[in-house]
Amino acid sequence: MGEAIVITSGKGGVGKTTTSANLGTALAILGKRVCLVDTDIGLRNLDVVMGLENRIIYDLVDVVEGRCKMHQALVKDKRFDDLLYLMPAAQTSDKTAVAPEQIKNMVQELKQEFDYVIIDCPAGIEQGYKNAVSGADKAIVVTTPEISAVRDADRIIGLLEQEENIEPPRLVVNRIRNHLMKNGDTMDIDEIVQHLSIDLLGIVADDDEVIKASNHGEPIAMDPKNRASIAYRNIARRILGESVPLQVLEEQNKGMMAKIKSFFGVRS
């Protein structure tokens, strides 16, 4: 049986959906069967980031309400043979259209067919959040170095730690801009990890190419040379249990990099 990982953040705009798309893509590149599940009912975006929006016939709500079979709603990403699929959210319903138990049952069924079920969680802590975490085994919290984003991440971590069936969450710090961090204009990695007190899974540099790729429906993880792609692929390898040093970012402050490496036990 596979495992389900919910990707959450507490607030919108930190790159949660982009992270979901790229981690799913990276895991598929590594040969794992992956199903991406968009639980942001009424505000779906994962299909656009994946370039699959024109191929949706049925959606998550159709499945739980019995209007179609599970396999009829799954959208196959033909770029990855039989490895990557999307379960789209409904665009015309609201988040109360499904209950947590229904999502949990659906995820359990998906875990029978896939190595990884990546659940893209809506922003906030209301019904959409409850739906998304209901079937998860693990959680990844995405934040950016801004104080407001870290504060919201802290709140979500507190909620996740109350979930009996979810392992302790791990952290991805997204959209790192070295010059701002070096000048003290944003929180540095050490401050973020110490404040949130969870394991650091990976860091992703801010990169305009990520936005361009998402707008074209081609997750940046498909580009083997891009630095953000390398970061996402390394995060995927860590999810698989590999010990992978953090990528050294261009113009990275040496002192900060030493602190980051210490979290992974990597010697400079």
Curated annotation (Swiss-Prot):
Location in or out of the cell: Cell membrane
Pfam family, one: CbiA
Record-listed ATP binding positions: K11, G12, G13, V14, G15, K16, T17, T18
Alphabetized GO MF terms: ATP binding; ATP hydrolysis activity
Stretches assigned to coiled coil: none
Membrane topology of this protein: Peripheral membrane protein
Database matches in NCBIfam families: minD_bact
Biological role stated in the UniProt entry: ATPase required for the correct placement of the division site. Cell division inhibitors MinC and MinD act in concert to form an inhibitor capable of blocking formation of the polar Z ring septums. Rapidly oscillates between the poles of the cell to destabilize FtsZ filaments that have formed before they mature into polar Z rings.
Name of the featured protein: Septum site-determining protein MinD
